[in-house]
Amino acid sequence: MSFISSDDSDFRWIDDYSQGKIQLGLGTGDPKFDEFFRYKKEFLIINGHSNVGKTTTALYLIANSAVQHGWKWVIYSSENRTASVKMSLMQFAMDKKVADMTYSERKEAYSWVQEHFTVINNEQVYSYADIILFMEKVMRQQDIDAIFIDPYNSLKLDMKGTNIGVHDYHYEAASEFLTFSKANDIAVWLNCHSGTEAQRRKGPDGLPVAPYAEDTEGGGKFVNRADCFVTIHRKVQSADPNIRKMSEIHVRKVREVETGGAPTPLEDPYCLIMNLSHTGFTTRIGQRALFQPINFLEQAQMPMNINFLG
């Protein structure tokens, strides 16, 4: 009966785990961050308030995965110009503004983006089913490690021919993304807005506090389906300019802790600080970037063959 799990396969996994043979998720470049978050081929949901830099922080983490691990991504960002998304990735890769790059550097950085990222045009509004269909088409043409959908809330509600309500539709969408991730061994990152009530909640300093997972617009159905859940928050109206530059990363849920990662302490998130040029982040502790910027011109220089000199 095919619906029953394989005892042999399950025992093999348990035996491998007991011997420390289960591979951990891929590292971030910072051992402290690795305690809470690792790159895995799983269904990850991000939430946060509007205008706190969710997309920017996520794109930096995405660029990090491409630089350090060679991950290849499909990106659908409906609220940002596709050229702007590519430019951000170029700048993160080189830690340099495009205006400060030479023409050759811009060409090399853009080629790197083309190699690692497929960006879906956002001239139309798509449903979650459309996005899955696009993914299947891209995967038939090339290897893909992950997809970033930004934001989920902008996707079209396509409920034609169904007898379900909006709540069930969103639950079905989350379930479909989870199933797609597992069936294809691919990471699915879903960026979501927080609900209105959560945006009204203030801390002792009078500033909005980070939303919880259940504060996601649409409710707790999203955290229920997610393998990993992350909240990105920034105090954009703080009087302290250093606080305004700091992105808090709250890891709310890690389903499979056996492969690395764990929820961050409630009042002590992991933090990244935007650099002065807005082309990268550094860690709060140690003030170091997660990865070394790529020097495309240095890579392009081939060593001279001097064997002919005898």
Locate each region found by the language model.
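The Walker A/P-loop phosphate-binding site
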Residues: S2-D95, I306-L309
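C-terminal regions of RecA-like/P-loop NTPase motor modules
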Residues: S2-R12, S18, K107-Y110, Y128-I144, ...
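Generic hydrophobic alpha-helical scaffold/packing signal
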Residues: D34, N47, L59-A63, V74, ...
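Short, well-ordered alpha-helix to beta-strand connector turns
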Residues: K41, H116, A226-D227
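Structural recognition of the conserved hydrophobic beta-strand(s) that form the central parallel beta-sheet
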Residues: I75, F148-I149, I186-H193
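Signature of the SF2 helicase/ATPase Hel1-core->accessory helical subdomain module
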Residues: S154, H193-T196
